[in-house]
Amino acid sequence: MKHIVKQIHFVGIGGAGMSGIAEVLVNLGYEVSGSDLSRNAVTDRLEALGARIAIGHDAANIAGANAVVVSTAVRSDNPEVLAARHQGVPIVQRAVMLAELMRLKQGIAIAGTHGKTTTTSLVASVLAAGGLDPTFVIGGRLISAGANARLGTGDFIVAEADESDASFLNLYPVIEVITNIDADHMDTYGHDFARLKQAFIEFTQRLPFYGSAVVCVDDPNVRQIIPFISKPVVRYGLSPDAQVRAEDIDARDGRMHFTVIREGRAPLAVVLNLPGLHNVQNALAAIAIATDLGVSDDAIQQALAEFNGVGRRFQRYGEVPSADGGQYTLIDDYGHHPVEMAATVAAARGAFPGRRLVLAFQPHRYTRTRDCFDDFVNVLSTVDALVLTEVYAAGEAAIATANGDALSRALRAVGKVDPVFVASVDDVPDALAGVARNGDVVITMGAGSIGGVPAKIVQNTQQKE
């Protein structure tokens, strides 16, 4: 590709999905430019690596580009997209560019409605511990690497495969993981769940005859598609028929202790430096792949025990002073679908037994809030105290029956929790100050702007000291 394409421009380069690909291309020696609406730590990092960053979208930003990379979040009337079309510069979807990177190495693609980022990070970490030095492109910041992407010298590239816009069908990896299949982003599939499941079947058809589909048999929807997968299947999970399964699971001190049972191998005692049964399942996917690729058991054990996590995935910010003179534990999480949220709440209960759980939640997208309204009410009713914000629109038009006020009224009608509603996410720190008590576990949660709240809370605390 390099002898034809020398300069590549990214529209929305600061996004999690775009920035990782951009970083790998910079490290491969391409000239990379990009634009975004505001600066952040990601754009600063890319600029330090040599990328040319512009703040704001303007036709002049694509000067000299041989290709313009966009995601489905970029509107067709974006001035840079219009300029590229006018100048005859190829407009490339993000997933297509990721597919080009996979052509350079052997691809390991992690798919599923929930758990992609953590599973991708675990796979990359375990393979790195085994000396395979993989390239990785992750939708979140791998804390141990300080980045969401890295160019390795090994044969493999590990990346997330996004089903939200069906773009994962552009990828042709040699190993695929399917963590689960749930009803999300249903507008892509005409609100037809059968079409969503069919897309995952088609995803497995991208595998070569020597490839493998590593699938979680604990998920009933994944189990249903297994008979339609024509390539070799490796089953993992907690179920008795899993070829790589966990037994003797014990949650202690925020870690998961369990024994891995693999066909033809001795049992392996593992300590995972993450809480929650869902993370045991994510780790099993990494163990299955690592075992297949010849990573030693010692390396697997070390990588999982030392795993530092991913930014915004049950990320601990430590102890914060509470208004009553004590301290509470502050955690941030990206969960925005009721299934993910329930898993995180369960993980928090297991990691901090007997402690009061306070949640500050920002719903993400009006359509998701509408489609999963009852499920949101159910999972939010399981916490001890709740601060609720208005929905983060993500470009959608407001829906009066699926906004923060409607959710608050529904929660009060159930009567298990009385939410403190704030119209703006900027008001969350003050609202939490009035709710959190000594010994509480406080989780900020959502896929929108609430991700900046924990740092503000910590900053406010430091200014008062």
Swiss-Prot record:
GO biological process: cell division; cell wall organization; peptidoglycan biosynthetic process; regulation of cell shape
A GO term from the CC aspect: cytoplasm
EC number: 6.3.2.8
Pathway as given in its UniProt record: Cell wall biogenesis; peptidoglycan biosynthesis
Catalytic activity: UDP-N-acetyl-alpha-D-muramate + L-alanine + ATP = UDP-N-acetyl-alpha-D-muramoyl-L-alanine + ADP + phosphate + H(+)
Record's keyword terms, sorted: ATP-binding, Cell cycle, Cell division, Cell shape, Cell wall biogenesis/degradation, Cytoplasm, Ligase, Nucleotide-binding, Peptidoglycan synthesis
Calcium recorded as keyword: no
Keyword Electron transport: no
Residues at which ATP binds: G112, T113, H114, G115, K116, T117, T118
Subcellular localization: Cytoplasm
Top-level taxon: Bacteria
InterPro entries: Mur-like_cat_sf, Mur_ligase_C, Mur_ligase_C_dom_sf, Mur_ligase_cen, Mur_ligase_N, MurCDEF_pg_biosynth, UDP-N-AcMur_Ala_ligase_MurC
General function of this protein: Cell wall formation.
Alphabetized NCBIfam families for the sequence: murC
Family that this chain belongs to: Belongs to the MurCDEF family.
Name of the protein described by the UniProt record: UDP-N-acetylmuramate--L-alanine ligase
Organism: Burkholderia ambifaria (strain MC40-6)
